[in-house]
Curated annotation (Swiss-Prot):
Transmembrane segments: 200-220, 276-296, 317-337, 357-377, 395-415, 416-436
Assembly description: Forms a complex with TatA.
Entry keyword annotation includes Acyltransferase: no
Organism: Haloferax volcanii (strain ATCC 29605 / DSM 3757 / JCM 8879 / NBRC 14742 / NCIMB 2012 / VKM B-1768 / DS2) (Halobacterium volcanii)
GO terms for cellular component: TAT protein transport complex
Lineage: Archaea, Methanobacteriati, Methanobacteriota, Stenosarchaea group, Halobacteria
Annotated Acidic residues bias: 13-22, 75-104, 122-138, 164-173
Family statement: Belongs to the TatC family.
Record protein name field: Sec-independent protein translocase protein TatCo
Bias kind Basic and acidic residues: ranges: 51-62, 105-117
Other observations noted: H.volcanii possesses two TatC translocases: TatCo and TatCt. Both paralogs are structurally atypical and may represent adaptation to the extensive utilization of the Tat pathway in haloarchaea.
Chain intervals for the UniProt region annotation (Disordered): 1-185
BP-aspect Gene Ontology terms: intracellular protein transmembrane transport; protein transport by the Tat complex
Amino acid sequence: MADEERDAGLSAADDETDASDDTDQRSSDGDADDADDASSSSDGPVYGRVTPRDETVTHGSDDDASADVAAETGDNGDDSDSDTDAAPDDADDSATDSDADSDDEPRLLADDEHTSHVPEGTYDDSSDESADDVDPDAAADGASPALTGEDEMGGVAPSSVSAEDADFDDEDVGGLVGEAPESDQEMPLTAHIEEMIRRLAVVLGVAGAITLVLFPGADILNALVDTQAAFGVHIPSATDVINFLWNSHIPGAETIVDRRPRLYGPLELILTKLKVAGLAGTVIGLPVFVYETYLFMRPGLYPKERKYYLAAVPTSLVLALVGVLFAHFVVLPAIFAYFTSYTEGTAVVAFGLKETFNLILILMGYMAVVFQIPLFVELAIMMNLVTRRWLEDRRLLFWGAFLGLAFLVSPDPTGMAPIIIGATMITLFEGTLAALRWTGN
């Protein structure tokens, strides 16, 4: 219908403009156009393009009507040809899509299609040959073929492991990894508590016995029996310890009557004797406490941990004893000499027993802890927590920390004791670093 309307419009326009043209000429032109359309249809359809016809159709002639019918028939033939040509194209598109879908689906590769990602020059055929040469009888017996360094994962050959690493045992790990030592046995919680109470009872028994011997046992025994004449040795009592410390630290205490200890309460002497006797019992019983603690933990310790424990604890006790002696011979005499020097001109020196012994015992205990600095530094370096160079680079920070602790914890508000203690801590720290540098650690 669209072709008929288009033909009608074209014929009307041609009638107005070309009315004088010859009818035969128009028919010959129509035949030429039909021949051109036939040739264009034989060449192939042109999609998306409409080619106008130049022929003019009239209604007054049968020849013209037959020409129009022939033209319409040719147009319909062209349309059918174009539809016929489009069908194979659609078939080709569907075939292409099906091929693309089939390429996306996984499929098994043939033997000749397998490729290797190993770079050239890195693959050794000798490994395949050695694998082919494996004795099947040896494989059946469970023996594995010897592996070379190249066959090992990561390229590490077993022969490259040092003898020290080969002798390494899980027990030497130190409890950080691996299983528990063989001596560790499962025990119920009540059994652990009973063992702990039993070992603590031993420690308390030893410390209590020493305390009772010093006070009041020694005083009673010395009053009843002349121990010097009977046993050849004088048993020291708490009173003897108090007199020794007082005469050693207070300047002129033996010659100046006013510098004898003053009592400002009815229980000061008794409490001071108990304090001194208890401190002596604790100090003497401390090795027993360390030994019982080691026996309690020994089943769960690795050999390396036992070695560290047995090396560190006696060293700590020795350092604590050195700190107490340093306080007794250096720190306390200097402090009390300073106290008496600036009070002699204005007042009578009369120290109370309780406050004086509190200061003495606190400073002795403080110096016992301060002298653990070399042990702490050594253990930190041995455990790879820090290095000597790291400590040396931050020495000013440690100096400030030492002085801050000395001024905060010291019982002396005048600043004399904190300065001595801070200088001692810095000296111990620097001396430890110097010793490590000298030994090459």
